[in-house]
């Protein structure tokens, strides 16, 4: 079935008589005119009408990438990585605009008139280069307000969205009469639909009138809206949820701060913070931590430093309970001993130079494979990657947040590389032991190999020999504390030899040394090692989403890291990696 223009017109005439409609309903009805699989191109009227009601309306927190009010409903990624949108702005031409313009004049349905008129006003110049008449903005604004005033909306949240658009249009036109009409519509709407425990259905009068500098209002209007919000906040503190309370507290706090009423601001925000503390005490540790972080965020927004310190103390004290409440998930994998022995023998055969080079190459994480595993996980378990994850230390302190996939793919990749390194640690441990046994490796042999490279400062030789000796003796506590700072020294030497800078200006005068993560992100390191190896070093040494060895050991934060042979093996691997940097031979 491929609709003809007459069929489209008949459907639109039918919908014209329906007083309560939304754009989604119209879009679905239009789609129903066309067979799901059809080789015949649809008539132009079908495409024009479908696009008109398929466009989404953007919000202040989710702005359109086109720089317009309307935005695509869906964005697809093509196999070549390019984006494909529906509806696409490229399909809107002068004929499309003319069609919508004509429909705007023909229809008496308020929803349709608002949509057609606003499409012309919003997209005409963007798509055709021609400025539309301001009458389209006036027509859309009048229709939007009529919808709200006559309660012709299907969903309250849609009415609020249309009200926000009406304010934006009225302000852009500098039409004070219509802005006044929008103010009255807003006050009446909030009075009709507000529910204390549904914060999406109230507060918009404050946002659109009190907190909007471009809207003229009297002191009485301000006072009444704020008084209503204060009453609502009082009710919520008694029996409301944290989220509604936060929404009210932040609005009131912002208002009082702007008016210079700091005592009132602190009173409002403190009441919310105390509610968070009381709620956290009666909540499981994991929920309690999120509640305390919620309070911390609000206190920070309003620069209440004394209260911030109190919340931080509560978060720290909660740490052990948080760790105890976490579940342990284990997985087992078998490594056939014969295959492992055969593999290790292949690695350790030959002279020491060959062995060290093989170990370096084989145990560099494959970022490409980690990306592949991550992408497979996102595809197979999409829900698991929709939400952020907290990374905690052994005391329950949140040290970083990873994800979700849409906004923090890099963080998830670091987490994946970290997991892959842990899996390969068993094999690395076995191979290093075999190499030490096979070649009777002692501290001097390894140090001599390292110092064939020019990146190891002579001043660090004794300390490196001591750290390697402790590693070979099985004193991993000492080895980790000796070798970790040596790696940082070598990193600075590599950057210096490459013409980079290792100092940065201190705020109080003088200079600081650049930290490990800054060195690993430097252009010099990227030019020498490439992005994959630099990412590996960051995961191991400096990124809190990874192993973060340098931070944990040098700041005394990670007891496990201090004693870990797995960490020692990786530190030795990094030293061998650095040793691959040799002077050019002619």
What are these regions (language model features)?
Residues 1-286:
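N-terminus-biased targeting/localization segments
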Residues 47, 103-112, 149-158, 196, ...:
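Amphipathic alpha-helical interface elements
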Residues 88-94, 264-269, 287-288, 438-439, ...:
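Helix-boundary capping/turn motifs
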Residues 260, 283-286, 303-306, 471-475:
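Short helix-adjacent coil turns
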Residues 293, 305-445:
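Internal, Lys/Arg-enriched amphipathic helical interaction segments that engage polyanionic partners
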Residues 452, 519-548:
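Short, mixed-charge amphipathic alpha-helical segments
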Residues 536-586:
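Charge-enriched, short contiguous segments at helix-coil
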